[in-house]
Regions:
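Carbohydrate-associated surface elements
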Residues: 182, 204
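Acidic donor-binding loop of glycosyltransferase active sites
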Residues: 300-314, 327
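A short, well-ordered alpha-helix in the C-terminal region of glycosyltransferases
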Residues: 357, 364, 371-385, 392-398, ...
Length: 420
C-alpha cells in the first residue's frame, strides 16, 4: 500500500489489487479493484466440486469486503499446518480447484487493466503466473517477503509439494524481488534458482506522522518494547526471558508488547506472559493498534525496541518504524538485521536466542544514556535519508522502466500494478 501510494505521488498509474482478503492498513487505502481469489470462495472451491461449477454471479457476492471481514472475525484460521492441501491447490493454478478464479484475475489484468508491469506480492500467488502470461505479455515479477516461514510450517507431503510447485512457477517470471541481500542469497538457494534471477528493491516507509524524536527520556522509566505479530517465530518468549533478567536488576523498568494476536497463538501468548501479569504497571499489552496514530504512540513510549525473532527476518519493517520515531533497537545478528543496523547505525546486534545477551545490551543502553541517544539520532536521520517511501518509489520506478523499455512497452507514464 505504501509502495503503491509513493509511486502514484510520482506520477505513475498504480493499481493495488487485493487477493484472498481486503487490504487492511493504518494509512490511506490505495486498493484499486475488487477482491480476487476471495478467501471464502477459495475455501469452498477446495471443499466442494459442486461449488466450483456454480456460475460466477452466484459466488461473487462472497468476495464483498464486508463479508470476508465478517468471516475472519469468527476465527478463520491462517495456520499453515491446516492449510497444506489448500496451498497446494492454489499453487497448481489452472490445474487445481481455483482454475476459474485464476482465469478471472488473468483476464482482468490482461484484457481490462493492461498494465506495463505486474508484481505479485508473494509466492503463493505464483499459481496464477501461467494463466496471466496467456493474457499479458509484459514484464512480470514476484516479490518475496517471508514466504519460506509459511512453507516450513506446512506438514508433509504439502511442504515438499508446495516448494516443488513454487520452484517451477517462479521460473516463468522475469525476476524475483526481495528487500535484503540476505534474503536474495537465501531464497536463491531455497528455490534452487540462480542468484541473478533475484533483485533487491529498497524497503521504505511513509514517514508522515512519525513525529517521535530522539529523546534522553530523563525521569521516565526505561521502557522496552516488542512490536510484531504475536507468534513463536517473532520471539516474544525471548523478550520475556530477557526482561525477567533485566527487571530483577531494575524494578522500575517496563515492558510494552504490541501486535496482532490471532486465535492460533493465544495459548502461546498466555503461557509466555503468565508471569508478567504479576508485575502490574511494569508490563502492558497494547494489543494491535487500531490506527496509525496509536501505533506511533506506542513507539514514542519506548526507550528501546527489540523483536528477537527465531526465524531469519527478510526485511525488518518494525526496525525502520522504531528508528523513524527516535527509538534505537537491539536485534539478533541474523536475517536482514545486520544489514539494517550497519546501514542505519541505529542499534545493537546480539547473538540469536540468548536472553542474557539481550538483557546485557539493554543494560548497556540503560547505563549509558548518551550512547542510547547517539544510536537514536543516527537511526532517526538515516531512515529519513535512505529508507523513505519517495526513494523507494524512485528506485523501483527506474527498475521497472528498464524492463518496460526492454520489452518495447514505452509510454510516457508507466502504469504499474503491484499486488498487495
Amino acid at each position: 500500500n505504501t509502495w503503491t501510494r509513493a509511486m502514484m505521488l510520482q506520477g505513475a498509474e498504480a493499481t493495488l489489487i487485493p487477493t484472498y482478503t481486503p487490504i487492511r492498513v493504518d494509512e490511506e487505502n490505495m486498493t484499486g479493484s475488487p477482491v480476487f481469489l476471495g478467501g471464502i470462495n477459495v475455501y469452498l472451491n477446495y471443499r466442494s466440486k459442486l461449488w466450483r461449477k456454480l456460475p460466477g454471479f452466484m459466488k461473487h457476492w462472497l468476495n464483498a469486503p464486508w463479508i470476508i471481514n465478517l468471516a475472519t472475525k469468527f476465527g478463520v484460521s491462517n495456520d499453515a499446518h491446516e492449510l497444506g492441501a489448500l496451498t497446494v491447490t492454489l499453487l497448481e493454478g489452472d490445474q487445481g480447484a481455483e482454475g476459474r478464479e485464476i482465469e478471472e484475475l488473468a483476464q482482468f489484468l490482461g484484457s481490462q487493466l493492461k498494465p506495463d508491469v505486474i508484481c505479485l506480492s508473494n509466492a503463493l500467488l505464483s499459481g496464477t503466473i501461467k494463466k496471466i502470461k496467456e493474457h499479458y505479455q509484459g514484464p512480470l515479477f514476484c516479490i518475496l517477503q517471508g514466504d519460506d516461514v509459511f512453507l516450513e510450517e506446512l506438514g508433509e507431503p504439502y511442504r515438499s509439494r508446495s516448494l516443488e510447485l513454487i520452484r517451477n512457477n517462479v521460473q516463468q517470471v522475469d525476476g524475483v524481488l526481495v528487500h535484503s541481500d540476505y534474503y536474495r542469497e537465501f531464497m536463491s538457494g531455497y528455490l534452487d534458482m540462480p542468484v541473478e534471477h533475484f533483485h533487491k528493491v529498497l524497503l521504505g516507509i511513509n514517514l508522515e506522522g512519525h513525529d517521535g524524536t530522539p529523546d534522553d527520556r530523563s525521569g521516565e522509566p526505561f521502557t522496552i518494547g516488542f512490536f510484531a505479530r504475536i507468534c513463536k517465530e517473532k520471539g516474544l518468549h525471548n523478550v520475556v526471558q530477557a526482561f525477567e533478567i533485566f527487571h530483577k536488576a531494575h524494578p522500575d523498568s517496563r515492558l510494552c508488547v504490541g501486535g496482532f494476536l490471532g486465535k492460533e497463538s493465544e495459548e502461546y501468548f498466555q503461557e509466555t506472559t503468565k508471569n508478567l501479569n504479576a508485575l502490574n504497571e511494569s508490563y502492558k499489552y497494547w494489543g494491535s493498534p487500531a490506527t496509525r496514530e496509536e501505533k506511533i504512540a506506542f513507539y514514542k513510549s519506548l526507550s528501546v525496541l527489540s523483536v528477537p525473532t527465531d526465524y531469519h527476518e527478510p526485511k525488518g519493517l518494525f526496525v525502520l518504524e522504531a528508528l523513524a520515531n527516535g527509538v534505537p533497537v537491539v536485534q539478533p545478528a541474523h536475517g536482514a538485521f545486520p544489514e539494517l543496523i550497519e546501514q542505519t547505525a541505529g542499534g545493537l546486534l546480539v547473538p540469536p536466542g540468548d536472553p542474557q545477551a539481550l538483557a546485557d545490551a539493554w543494560e548497556r543502553l540503560y547505563q549509558d544514556q548518551e550512547y542510547r541517544l547517539q544510536l537514536a539520532r543516527q537511526g532517526y536521520e538515516r531512515v529519513r535519508q535512505f529508507y523513505n517511501a519517495e526513494l523507494m518509489a524512485t528506485e523501483s520506478l527506474s527498475f521497472f522502466q528498464k524492463w518496460v523499455d526492454a520489452a518495447g512497452l514505452r509510454q510516457n507514464t508507466p502504469q504499474l500494478t503491484p499486488d498487495p
